Amino acid sequence: MEARDVLKRPVITEKSSEAMAENKYTFDVDTRANKTQVKIAVEEIFDVKVDKVNIINYKPKKKRMGRYQGYTNKRRKAVVTLKEGSIDLFN
């Protein structure tokens, strides 16, 4: 899996924006990607040093549309902590 396939998009929420002050950046990642692949992808794309990676899995939720029932897509989110002295990613 290539670096551009691992990272899907950055997660921009109030909680993730507050975490940026602590050098923590949040990304939606491919559901098959592991911590090592996420670390390599962030270091390759943004040219920074990664300290650690935490991964959160979200299960699909049931949703109804009238009488029809379906599921949302499952997601995987990675919180990447950069080493001190690294450049800000989004600034």
UniProtKB/Swiss-Prot annotation:
Belongs to the universal ribosomal protein uL23 family. The keyword Ribonucleoprotein applies. One of its GO terms (cellular component) is ribonucleoprotein complex. InterPro entries: Nucleotide-bd_a/b_plait_sf, Ribosomal_uL23-like, Ribosomal_uL23/eL15/eS24_sf. It comes from the Bacteria. Keywords: Ribonucleoprotein, Ribosomal protein, RNA-binding, rRNA-binding. GO terms for molecular function: rRNA binding; structural constituent of ribosome. Part of the 50S ribosomal subunit. Contacts protein L29, and trigger factor when it is bound to the ribosome. Transmembrane segments: none annotated. This is Large ribosomal subunit protein uL23. One of its GO terms (biological process) is translation. The keyword Kinase does not apply. One of the early assembly proteins it binds 23S rRNA. One of the proteins that surrounds the polypeptide exit tunnel on the outside of the ribosome. Forms the main docking site for trigger factor binding to the ribosome. The gene is rplW. PANTHER family: 60S RIBOSOMAL PROTEIN L23A.
